[in-house]
Amino acid sequence: MKLILTVLAFLSLQVALSDDVGRLYEWSKIDIVGVRPSVYDSSNIIPTGVAYDADSKMLFFGLPRKYSKVPITVAQLSTRSYNSAERRDPPLDKFSGKSKKPLTSVYQPVIDDCRRLWVLDVGIVEVKAERKTYPTKNPALVAFDLTKPDYPEIHRYELTGDAAKTPLGYGGFAVDVVNPKKCGKNDEKTYVYIANFVENSLIVYDKKKSDAWVLKDDSFKPEGVSTYTHNGKEHELKTGIFGIALGDRNKEGNRPAYYLAGSSTKLYRLDTKLLKKKGSKLVPKLIGDRGYKTEAIALAYDPETKVLFFAETDSRQVSCWNIKKELKPENVGVIYSSAKLNFATDMMVDSKGFLWFMSNGQPPFDEKMKYEDPHIRLMKVKTKKAIKGEKRCQG
């Protein structure tokens, strides 16, 4: 009887935590509009990253060529065209942006404060048999202007040398616009910070100087081995720095950069003032530990609530922490928990204060996971509403 009551209490908690979170879309397989079904395998189209432009109400997805027969590597979905209450699994459209060169394989899109869509083309496909179709090239950062029709490409930078080492190890990246009021002007300064979870390094790109460099630190390394459990089997992962999120700007335009390793429960912080100066000695600060089995590969900061959100990989939950409080397990709350959140892979806070998070059921290892139910899920919730019932994350 005690066991039954415990299970019922857990299920009640799941529902309570999940009530305010809206399930927008979910897919078992993804179809692409305008591409003949015979030329692609819909089960191999697995988004790893998502970005939402609140002004156009457009979603953008990174669809890496991790498996064979993936016809496009960036897709879009108009939330105006598909009401999730009517259809949960809409097909995706080909990205309408005008790229000057074909994109090889994109894992994550990011929208910056200037309404530019940045993608990091890793320049290599994971399926060796398809490298004749998609020749390997240098990885590249590419930006598209979302304020103009057809999203023209407005910036491209090829990574070389140490910055291009092990591109399949690129994790999340953050775009730092120092002063959004100067978007598009000659004196605009923008930096991009790219995590590499294999090399345990952070790449810094200076857009104005067209230069990139690599930073190393022990805090970028995995603490040990983390696990992902599926169908009763534990799969081991050992990943270094994976997620990075930027905090509030000060008067000089500098910000805290929060980061975590995929195989760690600790959270660190670096001042972007150091990141932006080539050759600086890093002085990372250990903020604290989130607690047992809280490993995550993605995090997002909400400036309105002063809360960091974490997409935890094996716990199947989204947690939260208010940056005004000490980081310790007692101060970490949970806004969403569901057995259906299979490997949360990306999250973001849009310009209207909504938290978006996605799971795709496919950790970064070779074995492809099998699912009977829809495993690609995209969720949305207003940040203020998300923490309303979670006192630990309130200011």
Curated annotation (Swiss-Prot):
It comes from the Eukaryota. Keywords: Secreted, Signal. InterPro entries: 6-blade_b-propeller_TolB-like (IPR011042), Royal_jelly/protein_yellow (IPR017996). Residues 1-18 form the signal peptide. Salivary gland (at protein level). Gene3D superfamilies: TolB, C-terminal domain (2.120.10.30). It is found in: Secreted. It holds the Pfam family MRJP. Coiled coil: none annotated. The keyword Signal applies. One of its GO terms (cellular component) is extracellular region. Exacerbates Leishmania infection in mice when co-injected with parasites and yellow-related salivary protein M10. Belongs to the major royal jelly protein family. Probably modulates blood feeding of sand flies on vertebrate species by binding and sequestering different mediators involved in the host response. Functions as a chemoattractant for host neutrophils; likely acts through a G-protein-coupled receptor and effect is dependent on calcium influx and phosphatidylinositol 3-kinases (PI3K) activity. This is Yellow-related salivary protein M35. The gene is M35.
